Amino acid sequence: MSKPSVLKGCLESLVALEKTKRIPKKPSCDASPLISNFENWSGKPRKLYLRDARSMKRQGLPYELNSNMFAQLLASPMRLDKITRVRAPKELLVQIKLRKADTDISAARGKPFELRPSFGMERGHPTSYVSNSVALVHKYASSAMKWLPSSANSTIRHINQADVATQPEWYSQAYTEQMLGSLREALSSTLMHLGKAPESDPRDVIIVCNPQLPAISLRKSENPFIALATTVLNLYPIKDPELEKVVNNRDIELCSSKHRSLCFLIYRLLAFQADRII
């Protein structure tokens, strides 16, 4: 048999196979029962996953989590806490960056790199996370090298631990001052604009400076149709005269969704100093 006839026969066979190709049958269900009913056979509790906060209202669950400050904290992406080795929402942790050391530190210690906290959840530089607790950081300060970002030990970027300076003392000094400075500025700016325009959103957070109250508490809302409870954030345990002067013995009412960054900042500072407050 000649080559052209063999080639012709192969092409005819391929065409015949194409015509007789079976189309896969579409499953009767939209999602596999192994996914939709995972909790029934895995022994794990059911988890509720929603695409957006409004879907709860459509399903008859008016929890208003999109305007709940604590729900927003818990909804932040999960990260590994290098101290406790537990995954937690990153808004409840402190971001640590591996950076090139300042000139004076590099000259004094002979270490070209240092681990430093990042206040505003910055991008760039190798990153890790630790507990937002001054007590835990001081307790485990001797093992601070374990906080080194995993990417620092990759095959592309390998950094010797002997070249990294750790400064756990920043928790009680520079980092606290950085948070306090940002809080003073943010609170003063908010108060300047608070009364200039009418607030249409419900005010579900109250900032006070009261020695009689705990750092964080809940107060039953005067209007249950707007919010079941109001979160009270007490600045008194921080013991900062400038903040006390700004608050000036008054109750400052805020909307958590509108003043999200300020509410988060106060919560983080109170949680950071919680062991000292208690």
UniProtKB/Swiss-Prot annotation:
Keywords: Mitochondrion. One of its GO terms (cellular component) is mitochondrion. Disulfide bonds: none annotated. It comes from the Eukaryota. It is found in: Mitochondrion. Required for respiratory activity and maintenance and expression of the mitochondrial genome. Belongs to the RRG8 family. This is Required for respiratory growth protein 8, mitochondrial. It comes from Lachancea thermotolerans (strain ATCC 56472 / CBS 6340 / NRRL Y-8284). The gene is RRG8.
